[in-house]
Amino acid sequence: MADDAGLETSLCSEQFGSGEARGCRVAADGSLQWEVGGWRWWGLSRAFTVKPEGRDSGEVGAPGAPSPPLSGLQAVFLPQGFPDSVSPDYLPYQLWDSVQAFASGLSGSLATQAVLLGIGVGNAKATVSAATATWLVKDSTGMLGRIVFAWWKGSKLDCNAKQWRLFADILNDVAMFLEIMAPVYPICFTMTVSTSNLAKCIVSVAGGATRAALTVHQARRNNMADVSAKDSSQETLVNLVGLLVSLLMLPLVSGCPGFSLGCFFFLTALHIYANYRAVRALVMETLNEGRLRLVLKHYLQRGEVLNPTAANRMEPLWTGFWPAPSLSLGVPLHRLVSSVFELQQLVEGHQEPYLLCWDQSRNQVQVVLNQKAGPKTILRAATHGLMLGALQGDGPLPAELEELRNRVQAGPKKESWVIVKETHEVLDMLFPKFLKGLQDAGWKTEKHQLEVDEWRATWLLSPEKKVL
């Protein structure tokens, strides 16, 4: 009770991070007496005195802070200010990521042993020149693949970071399997290890790029460098442990291909499962096409906006690498119009800084963006395109859209531009409510992860309108 009274009449207080606060009261001799709490795992609750001349020599650390050994480990392996300085999904993701890194390290040891065996290590008939030539071909193939893949898919990795992260790790398992099987067919050894290294270089690009995107998501205090550095420290520790375990494992499997292959399949299964759990633990708070499609569908059917946690839990992870081209944002204007009449059809009836063309037969939407189009405009254009796609679906829709869908699905088909014009009017009423619902649910609408090309255009409005 005395402790409680001390807290009630405390002169000042302090706390470490998000830990429990402690109060300070004045003792009879004028010294400061700090209340120490938060040591729940020891069941301690006591007070200690700090004299004016010994302010920095307190007996016990800050309440709510870890004990000295745990504090040291946290300082080495976790970002400063953890857990407040990172996203809520940081810890579960990092734990599963460490498990997958450990399994991958052991699998990599088995693959490296197989490659060295195939090159000729331990074989008196093998020549240095042949081994060197094989190694050079393998490395050069991987370097070229790295450049080509970065050019081909580099701009798309941000949009589906979770899917590409999972894809990269599965491809890494395929690459290691090829390396393990390479010595079995010596005549194809060079081609097999070159293909494997090509896959590993793609993994390096996709994995590194998506890891950077996830670091941006996890860092909540502009501490991306700290989060990245501590992630590297965690990975190094896991790799070190994996190396020590490999030193014990390799002598056991050496000379027994069947047992080695069995270990590899077990580690691969663990690796894929841990990767799936790690990626599934992520809660991205920005909208890409997949998450926007889920949220919009739920909103049109039930009138509620899914929060980021629910939407990320429903987001498919095994698809999305090569999505159907149903929505294209930032297309060139010359692709959509070839006459003044066609331009007038797209422009009239609205003043939004984007033009939308809908191909009903292929359910494909192409959007031309104005020079002034910002994140909100792009989000509206994407919502508009996905809403048009919903007109050809079967789920329940709001009354305005249900009536429009009945007219669309009842032949003969209307001109697409007429439907687009009518949906502009519906969206004028629907989108402000939808946008507010997104913000209230916790989505970050000031930025997005939609795939947008770089084409921009300017145009005049229809005669009854003014210049945009």
Curated annotation (Swiss-Prot):
Where it mainly occurs, coarsely classed, is membrane
User: What is one term from the GO cellular component aspect held by the record?
Assistant: membrane
Regions that span the bilayer: 247-267
**Keywords on record:** Acetylation, Membrane, Phosphoprotein, Transmembrane, Transmembrane helix
Q: Which residues carry this modification: N-acetylalanine?
A: A2
Subcellular location as annotated? Membrane
Look up and give the membrane topology term. Answer: Single-pass membrane protein
The UniProt entry's sequence similarity note says: Belongs to the RUS1 family.
Report the protein name in the record.
Answer: RUS family member 1
